[in-house]
Design a protein with these regions (language model features):
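Short beta-strand segments at enzyme active-site cores
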Residues: 5, 10-12, 114-118
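Conserved beta-alpha-beta core of the PfkB/ribokinase-like small-molecule kinase fold
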Residues: 90-146
Length: 146
């Protein structure tokens, strides 16, 4: 979308390391604002790797070393009909939940459109029952669900 001139804000976090620098450079090269990306000085950028077996089924390996303070950003000011995309475990993570709710509450107040892609991975299946209320809450905020 940013390549077509649509202004994009990406809210996330990364480490102050080589991986984080590659991500930030890619975003800037593609005209995506990095104003709302928290670059944490402690911890490393998370890395996810996918390996395909003989049946082309993916097996994922996740490497992460997060700091205690997470998603330390001031959110952009949303306006009516802005589109907020949330999803995956990031939108469910109890450590980030308060910050995610802050964004969702602002979206609701300003009448922004919330697109929710649960993208629930089997790597979190043991937490499914515990996370169900959060998934339902995200569905309640959503205008569009993938």
């Amino acid at each position: 979308m940013s390549r077509t001139g649509v202004p994009i804000c990406f809210i996330s976090e990364t480490g102050n390391d080589h991986v984080g620098n590659i991500i930030l450079r890619f975003m800037r090269d593609n005209h995506i604002s990095t104003d709302y990306v928290n670059v944490f000085p402690d911890g490393k950028s998370p890395v996810s790797l996918a390996f395909l077996d003989d049946n082309s089924d993916a097996e994922y390996i996740f490497y992460k070393d997060y700091p205690k303070q997470r998603l330390d950003v001031i959110y952009p000011k949303l306006e009516e009909d802005d589109i907020v995309v949330i999803g995956s475990y990031y939108a469910l993570n109890p450590v980030l939940r308060e910050k995610v709710l802050e964004l969702l509450d602002q979206a609701r107040e300003k009448k922004a459109i919330v697109y929710y892609d649960p993208n629930f991975r089997s790597s979190h299946k043991e937490e499914a029952i515990k996370l169900a209320p959060t998934i339902i809450e995200n569905l309640e905020y959503a205008n569009i669900v993938r």
